[in-house]
Design a protein with these regions (language model features):
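Residues that define the transmembrane beta-barrel architecture of outer-membrane proteins
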Residues: 1, 38-44, 88-92, 119-125, ...
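Beta-barrel outer-membrane channel/assembly domains of diderm bacteria
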Residues: 1-54
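Short loop/turn motifs that connect adjacent beta-strands in outer-membrane beta-barrel proteins
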Residues: 2-4, 53-58, 102, 130-140, ...
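Transmembrane beta-strands of outer-membrane beta-barrel proteins
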Residues: 3-9, 62-66, 106-110, 140-146, ...
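Surface-exposed coil loops of outer-membrane beta-barrel proteins
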Residues: 60-130, 145-147
Length: 184
């Protein structure tokens, strides 16, 4: 299945609206007109998606600016903070997912900043996978590389690598629950 999607990302912080200039001191951030409901549109979403089933193997490829929720890997909060998930809820890049009856894997790239005079080059390559090796046991991992590079005015490069392998014991079938598992 081929899809071409276009939309807009709308965001409103509950309770965030401008205060009347008569009620706040001059220069207060709370009087900023950008807090009004006229400035809800944050980002254009535009992406191409391909979903294909080849025997028992499913393949999904998404490219463009698309919702972060499309990345379905089992990532710790150490990888993606709540504020990143909420305030930067779109990925700008590529996501490839492969699924089998007893395993699933994904790899993606989020391009967060293009090199410029004052803007640093930033991107994140992330991956997650899990495979069932026995009825109660799965092996999995999540990993990322975060690249934070220089700009024309600031030098230096930082590359952070985070890898989280795990064992997962699934007890749900023993007690008739949808989910009951232990990750080590």
């Amino acid at each position: 299945t081929h899809r071409l999607m276009i939309g807009v990302d709308i965001m409103k912080d509950f309770g965030a609206s401008p205060v009347s200039p008569e009620r706040a001191p001059e220069g207060s951030a709370e009087t900023d007109r950008r807090l009004s409901n006229l400035n809800l549109f944050r980002e254009l979403t535009l992406y191409y998606s391909l979903d294909r089933q080849m025997g028992k193997t499913g393949l999904s490829v998404t490219a463009g600016i698309f919702p972060r929720r499309m990345a379905e890997g089992n990532y710790s909060r150490a990888f993606f903070s709540d504020s990143l998930r909420f305030y930067d809820n779109n990925l700008e890049g590529l996501l490839v997912k492969v699924s089998r009856p007893k395993a699933n894997f994904e790899i993606g790239c989020d391009w967060m900043g293009q090199y410029g005079t004052f803007r640093r080059e930033r991107f994140m390559i992330f991956s997650s996978g899990e495979g069932k090796v026995a009825s109660m046991l799965s092996l999995g991992y999540s990993a990322y590389l975060y690249h934070y590079s220089c700009s024309e005015t600031a030098g230096g490069v930082v590359d952070n690598v985070l890898i989280n392998p795990y064992l997962k014991f699934d007890f749900a079938h023993m007690v008739d629950f949808q989910i009951l598992s232990l990750r080590l």
